[in-house]
Amino acid sequence: MAASRIAVDAMGGDNAPEAVVEGAIQALHQTEGELSVLLVGPEEQLHGLLASRPEAPEERLRIVDAPEAIGMGETPSTAVKQKPNSSIHQGLAAHHDDHADAFVSAGNTGAIMAASMFILQRIPGVERPSIAGFFPTLKGSSVVLDIGSNVDCKPAHLLQFARMGTVYARQVLKTDPPSVGLLNIGEEPGKGNEQVKAAHELLRDADDVHFVGNVEGGDLLFYAADIIICDGFVGNALLKFGESMSTVLSDMCQQEMERQGLAPDEQKLVAGVLDEVREGFDPEALGGAPLLGVNGNVLVGHGRSTADVIAQMIHSARTIATENVAHALEEAFQSSSA
């Protein structure tokens, strides 16, 4: 894999900056010299954290001073305009100016989206950039677009999500051609509201999308398609359901083991199996959600991301940069508009 420079928002997330710095160090130790990290945040504070970590590979770590931070509760558009020296703004600027090949943040999702649109700009032809998520199934994770960045969508937007998801799956997941399903209340083409019925027609007629038809909610866990298309309102609810599902099932099993009076060693054995299942159903293990449709490589993480998740996000960002997803999207939208 080619050498990559990843800009990381050191102030993004509930556990920042400590977990972010720890995650960056982990990622660097997990690779050879072909990876370097730009930690973006208050210079003095970050120097202090690194000084207490003598094992940090300083030759592959650089600090980009960003004295301001955008909080999780701040209004995205206002924060981006009023805080040009924030870690999100400066990290994206480093990517835009080619000092970094990708940008990673577990910070305010709306601010990341707004700043990316402002600094990196949309790819020509893309009306709505989309954040893609991953829904756990029995056969791996399906890519879901959109997961909350676009709650009100036109049918044409859903078609664009399908095109972006197709490029991502082909470039990063090496699935060719990836299957695309439209989340609906029934499998028949005439099912759904007006938005979904119109989107079905557009997807059916698109020659650059491998559309397999409508997908019902009950089929999602059985891997109905490589890519699932829906608006961000539905997608966000779906993703959060997936995040909580394994925890609830695990707790229910624990309660049942106690009710049946299983011995401690028996409970430990079952708990080990459940932990493996939970890990397989953990969308964070895949390393962040890609923001598709802007002129750059941006990964968005959950606010509660741990050091392990930050490290995985850095590796995922490196893959997206190496596979040049943004350029592939640009080519795809040029072809679709021709």
Curated annotation (Swiss-Prot):
GO biological process, one term: fatty acid biosynthetic process
The encoding gene: plsX
Location relative to the cell: Cytoplasm
UniProt entry tagged with the keyword Cytoplasm: yes
Organism: Salinibacter ruber (strain DSM 13855 / M31)
GO cellular component: cytoplasm
Sequence similarity: Belongs to the PlsX family.
Keywords, in A-Z order: Cytoplasm, Lipid biosynthesis, Lipid metabolism, Phospholipid biosynthesis, Phospholipid metabolism, Transferase
Pathway(s) this gene product operates in, as recorded in its UniProt entry: Lipid metabolism; phospholipid metabolism
Lineage of producing organism: Bacteria, Pseudomonadati, Rhodothermota, Rhodothermia, Rhodothermales
Protein name listed in UniProt: Phosphate acyltransferase
HAMAP family documented for this protein: PlsX (MF_00019)
Subunit structure: Homodimer. Probably interacts with PlsY.
